[in-house]
Amino acid sequence: PVRVLLLESGEPCNMAYFAPVQLAPEKEDAASASVWRDGSALRAENPRCPYKDVRVTLRCSAPWVSAGTDARFLCGEDSGALRRGFPALAGAFRLEKEAVMLLGTADVPALLDIARAREALAKTKAWWAQRVRGEKYSAAMPESVRRLAPWSAYAALCCRVLGRGSLYQSGGAVGFRDQLQDRINLLPVDAAGARAHILACCAHQYAEGDVQHWYHPTGGEIDKGVRTDCSDDLLWLPWAVCEYVRATADESLCAETAPYLTSPPLARGEHSRYETPSLSGETGTVLDHCHRAAALVLRRGIGEHRLLRMGGGDWNDGFDAMGESAESVWLTWFASGVFHDFS
């Protein structure tokens, strides 16, 4: 992908652009990134990036005034707190009237042409207008809701689904429960996307029934993710299947197949493990995947108050240290609703 910025000014001016570079899962890994000038472009890469051959490029159609490769570009050479380890794509440019700036992992210098950039913007707007057009929403909705719905769908698709981010976190991982909720909420505009995502989630379930709480798609056969004893995430799979079938009447999804993952089960006292699992050699229908999720919830049992156990946290991740005896009112409600719909 590439971000295209169309810049305009009523009079000539200097402008600066600054983008810190991480390109890795952890902030500490940013120190391994390298940034260099390559002709009319700035490029950056990080050997700690989990994706192969990823390189970010910054270009601008306006003349370069200066370029920088770290935070000293903004804060000065004498800033003791900003030594090597804070790499950045940074540049100052002379904007006469209008210009195009490109930043992304795709290097498309042809878009520096202002006419082409405007054409790309028009095509992008048309694509989104078709994707989230208002007539996809129920006429029974209040007019104000129908007017806002396309914008909400646009924001959810861009941020949550494509960007895998949020206001509070931009980790780039796929949250098992989070994106199932996002995809189901977007059924009016992208039922096919919801179907495909349900199948992808099935492929991130362990043979025992639990799931990767979140994972980083790598484009390979198996994604690296975290195995947890979270009590609710696996239940969002049968919930999503029920919601999808109810909305689309497409029961064929239930007969689709997907593999199971395998790894050593979490040891007693081990609440999570970041790992690359293996394929178990087993496959099952979507219906089977849902059955295994429900069965594991029941096997985990109930507590003193006959409520389902909290485990490593329910929908509220902040309850991850409540202990083995903790019970969850919310989880019991949710499971009851899912089991009722699934039956």
PLM features per residue range, with description:
Residues 1-2, 337:
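Coil-to-beta-strand transition motifs
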Residues 2-5, 180, 233-235:
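Residue-level detector of short, conserved catalytic/binding motifs and their immediate flanks
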Residues 3-173, 264-280, 287, 343:
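Acidic/polar, glycine-enriched structural segments that form the non-catalytic walls/loops
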Residues 117, 124, 183-304, 329-336:
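Aromatic-rich carbohydrate-recognition surfaces in CAZymes
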Residues 131-173, 196-220, 285-324:
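Extended glycan-interaction surfaces of carbohydrate-active proteins
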Residues 174, 323-334:
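Short, contiguous, pocket-lining structural segments
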Residues 336-343:
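N-terminal leader/propeptide and maturation segments of large enzyme subunits in energy/redox metabolism
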